[in-house]
């Protein structure tokens, strides 16, 4: 199963955040949603970042994904721990 990364995580990776790299599980496959890809493409990307974005798996973003993402966002905004 793929785990999605939000734009902030990807931007931190692009900035070379070594602490973040240590926190990521090496056995996990990470990906980004096509919405995250859009958001990142709105900014100025270096060639190596473009290559990274071409290679990282893309997660489908359907209605059920949008609803779940909205629920996670609201709960995180309230400071609550997410309960699926």
Curated annotation (Swiss-Prot):
Matches recorded under Gene3D superfamilies: 5'-nuclease (3.40.50.1010)
InterPro entries assigned to the protein according to its UniProt record, in alphabetical order: PIN-like_dom_sf
Recorded superkingdom: Archaea
Family statement: To M.jannaschii MJ1121.
Identification of the protein by name: Uncharacterized protein AF_1996
Species of the source: Archaeoglobus fulgidus (strain ATCC 49558 / DSM 4304 / JCM 9628 / NBRC 100126 / VC-16)
Source taxonomy: Archaea, Methanobacteriati, Methanobacteriota, Archaeoglobi, Archaeoglobales
């Amino acid at each position: 199963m793929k785990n999605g990364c939000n734009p902030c995580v990807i931007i931190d990776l692009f900035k070379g955040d070594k602490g973040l790299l240590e926190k990521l599980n090496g056995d996990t496959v990470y990906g980004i949603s096509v919405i995250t890809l859009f958001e990142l493409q709105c900014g100025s990307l270096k060639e190596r970042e473009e290559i990274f974005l071409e290679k990282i798996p893309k997660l489908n973003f359907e209605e059920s994904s949008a609803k779940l993402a909205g629920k996670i966002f609201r709960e995180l905004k309230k400071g609550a721990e997410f309960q699926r």
